[in-house]
Amino acid sequence: MNPIICAASVIGAGLAIGLGAIGPGIGQGTASGKAIEGLARQPEAEGKIRGTLLLSLAFMEALTIYGLVVALAIIFANPFV
């Protein structure tokens, strides 16, 4: 195996998971903060806000999992080797 390709694959995998987690992390923080603000304004809408928040957090977390899958594919099923 070419050491340059191996090193580039590891760096690419690190970037894939690192950059793939930044956006969802920021989005989850923003969504959680806005949900808390909504609960503070309308406590009677707790169930609806919580359900919507959990669903949106699951979709955001899926993006991070896609980054993990890409990183694992780059490391273990490298098409360049």
UniProtKB/Swiss-Prot annotation:
CDD domains membership: ATP-synt_Fo_c_ATPH (cd18183)
Organism, scientific name: Euglena gracilis
Assembly, per entry: F-type ATPases have 2 components, F(1) - the catalytic core - and F(0) - the membrane proton channel. F(1) has five subunits: alpha(3), beta(3), gamma(1), delta(1), epsilon(1). F(0) has four main subunits: a(1), b(1), b'(1) and c(10-14). The alpha and beta chains form an alternating ring which encloses part of the gamma chain. F(1) is attached to F(0) by a central stalk formed by the gamma and epsilon chains, while a peripheral stalk is formed by the delta, b and b' chains.
Coiled-coil residue spans: none
Sequence similarity: Belongs to the ATPase C chain family.
Something else known: In plastids the F-type ATPase is also known as CF(1)CF(0).
Site (Reversibly protonated during proton transport): E61
Higher taxonomy: Eukaryota, Discoba, Euglenozoa, Euglenida, Spirocuta
Pfam family, one: ATP-synt_C
Localisation per UniProt entry: Plastid, Chloroplast thylakoid membrane
Protein's membrane topology: Multi-pass membrane protein
Purpose: F(1)F(0) ATP synthase produces ATP from ADP in the presence of a proton or sodium gradient. F-type ATPases consist of two structural domains, F(1) containing the extramembraneous catalytic core and F(0) containing the membrane proton channel, linked together by a central stalk and a peripheral stalk. During catalysis, ATP synthesis in the catalytic domain of F(1) is coupled via a rotary mechanism of the central stalk subunits to proton translocation. Key component of the F(0) channel; it plays a direct role in translocation across the membrane. A homomeric c-ring of between 10-14 subunits forms the central stalk rotor element with the F(1) delta and epsilon subunits.
Name the UniProt record assigns to this protein: ATP synthase subunit c, chloroplastic
Alphabetic keyword roster: ATP synthesis, CF(0), Chloroplast, Hydrogen ion transport, Ion transport, Lipid-binding, Membrane, Plastid, Thylakoid, Transmembrane, Transmembrane helix, Transport
Residues passing through the membrane, by range: 3-23, 57-77
Gene3D superfamilies: F1F0 ATP synthase subunit C (1.20.20.10)
